[in-house]
């Protein structure tokens, strides 16, 4: 089974958590794209979706799934999204697709976060994948200096502007032993919009695509 087939297995397995008549939180990325395809088979049974990115919104609308504004929804039953890394405590690094802030907002209004990944994303310690930080453009250099003080090696993601009009610093070289603490510290730096650590709001369910099919951990 290829990596993409494992992503597809995870994405389609998440469909069992979608209830009829609900509004579904939808993340961003290659694994989520498979979930959106699956969701398209239920489009007449759900009210619609809240999307974490312009890219996902376009894919949802192409399948004729109604997309609601986040501000118009009080809460969501589920949010389905991928991760760049996930540890045994279900803390995650997200933001490889630069949608981390909107992903964090949609996750915050959701009762259940369902993380869909292939087996390559599971790690013992977060940080091998560079940690994305969304930054107000005028603060880029200052934030980079502060991240160096924390032991990281921040690299400006060239040619990337987030859906919010900001920039991304990818922080290399961090072995993240205490994700919640680091999330608080980086979010406290002036000019940081958010860091791609999802530790305070980790995953509730993990669906991993494996060569044998989807493995579900609740």
From Swiss-Prot:
UniProt keywords, alphabetically: Isomerase
Catalytic activity of the protein: aldehydo-D-ribose 5-phosphate = D-ribulose 5-phosphate
Active site (record annotation): 103
Subunit structure: Homodimer.
The gene coding this protein: rpiA
Name recorded for this polypeptide: Ribose-5-phosphate isomerase A
Binding-site residues, substrate: 28-31, 81-84, 94-97, 121
Family, as annotated: Belongs to the ribose 5-phosphate isomerase family.
EC number: 5.3.1.6
Pathway(s): Carbohydrate degradation; pentose phosphate pathway; D-ribose 5-phosphate from D-ribulose 5-phosphate (non-oxidative stage): step 1/1
Any one GO molecular function term: ribose-5-phosphate isomerase activity
A Gene Ontology cellular-component term: cytosol
């Amino acid at each position: 089974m290829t990596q993409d087939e494992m992503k597809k297995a995870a994405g389609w397995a998440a469909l069992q958590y979608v209830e009829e008549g609900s509004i579904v939180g939808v993340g961003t990325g290659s694994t989520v794209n498979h979930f959106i395809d699956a969701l398209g088979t239920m489009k007449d049974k759900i009210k619609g979706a809240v999307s974490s990115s312009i890219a996902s919104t376009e894919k949802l609308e192409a399948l004729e799934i109604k997309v609601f504004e986040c501000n118009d929804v009080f809460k969501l039953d589920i949010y389905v999204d991928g991760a760049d890394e996930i540890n045994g405590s279900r803390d995650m690094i997200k933001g490889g697709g630069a949608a981390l802030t909107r992903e964090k907002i949609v996750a915050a209004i959701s009762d259940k976060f369902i993380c869909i990944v292939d087996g390559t994303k599971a790690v013992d310690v977060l940080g091998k994948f560079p940690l994305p930080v969304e930054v107000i453009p005028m603060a880029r250099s200052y934030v980079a200096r502060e991240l160096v003080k924390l032991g990281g090696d921040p690299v400006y993601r060239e040619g990337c502007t987030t859906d919010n009009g900001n920039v991304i610093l990818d922080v290399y070289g961090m072995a993240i032993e205490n994700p919640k603490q680091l999330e608080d510290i980086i979010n406290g730096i002036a000019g940081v919009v958010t860091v791609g650590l999802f530790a305070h709001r980790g995953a509730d369910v993990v669906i991993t695509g494996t060569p044998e099919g989807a493995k579900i951990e609740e």
